[in-house]
Amino acid sequence: MINKKLFALAGVTLSLSLSAISAQVEPLRVAADPVPHAEILNDIKKIDPKLDLKVIELTSGVNANELLAHGDVDANYFQHLPYLKDQEKALGKTFVVAAEVHIEPLGIYSRKIKALPDLPENASVAVPNNSSNLSRALFLLQKQGLITLNAHFTDPSTTLATPKDIVANPKHLKILEIEAAQLPRSLDDADLVVINGNYALEAGLVPSKDALGLESADHNPYANLLVTTPELAHDPRIVALAKDLTSPQVRDFIQKTYHGSVIPVQAGHD
C-alpha cells in the first residue's frame, strides 16, 4: 500500500515537473506591426537563437493590447506610452513596459506641394484619429508653424490636444481625422498627410527623406515599447527579449536598415 502511494506521489511530482519544463520552453509570443517591429524581432532570432520567439504580425483592425489582456500573446511591440495609457483606460487593464526600444518620428507628407510654405489656404490635412496620435499630429503642425494650440498644451506626453484646442489657424486648414493605418492612402486626396513612421515605411516612404516636416528625436516621448502583463514582467523570456531589443547589435541593425527613419532610443537620447 505504501509503495502504491509512493508511486502515485512520484507520478504527480513527475507530471508537475514535466509541466514546468514544458512551460519554460514554450515560445514567447509577441504581437508586432510588420514594419519595423516584426523586422527587428526577426533579426533578434538571428542574434539570439536560444530565445524561442514567435512573432505574430498585426493586421489592420487587430488590437494587440486586447490580445495581451486575453492571454493570446505574451507581449506586444508596436506602441508608445501615451497610446498605452489611453488603452489601459479604455480596456480597464494595467500593463508593464519591459523596454523602450526605438522612435519612429511622425512625419508630414504631400504629393501636392514640395515644401510647407507652399501650402495653400483652406488646405486639407489628414491626421490620425486615435486620441494620442491625433494630439501628437497637432503638436507637430504647431511646431511647423501651421497652427497654434491653446497655451496650456505644452507637453505632448501629458496633455492630449484636439482640433477644438486650435486657437490660431492662419491658413484655415481643414483637419481630417482618419484611421492611422489608412493615412498613406490619403496622399492622393489630402494636401498634407501626417503619418506614423511605421505606416510610412510600409507605404514605401522614407521619412528621413520624404517628410516635409519630421518630429525631432531629442526628448521625444513617443518611444516604441515592449509591453507585457504584470504576471509576465519577470519572466526570463521577457527579460531576455528586453535585453536583446536594447542591445548594441539591435541598435546597429536599426541604424543600418532604416537610415534615420527609425531611431534607437539610445541614439535619440545621446
What do these predicted regions represent?
Residues A98-T148, R251:
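A conserved helix-loop-strand patch within extracytoplasmic ligand-binding domains
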Residues A99-S110, S135-Q142, L201-K243, L245-D270:
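Periplasmic-binding protein-like
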Residues D86-A98, R111-I113, L187-D189, V194, ...:
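Ligand-binding "clamshell"
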Residues I56-E66, F153-R185:
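Short helix-initiation/N-cap motifs at beta->coil->alpha
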Residues P27-K54, N63, L67-A69:
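Short, polar/charged alpha-helical segment
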Residues A69-Q79, A123, L146, K171-L173, ...:
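Alpha-to-beta junction loops
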Residues V35, T59-G61, N76-K85, H102, ...:
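Beta->alpha turn/N-cap motifs
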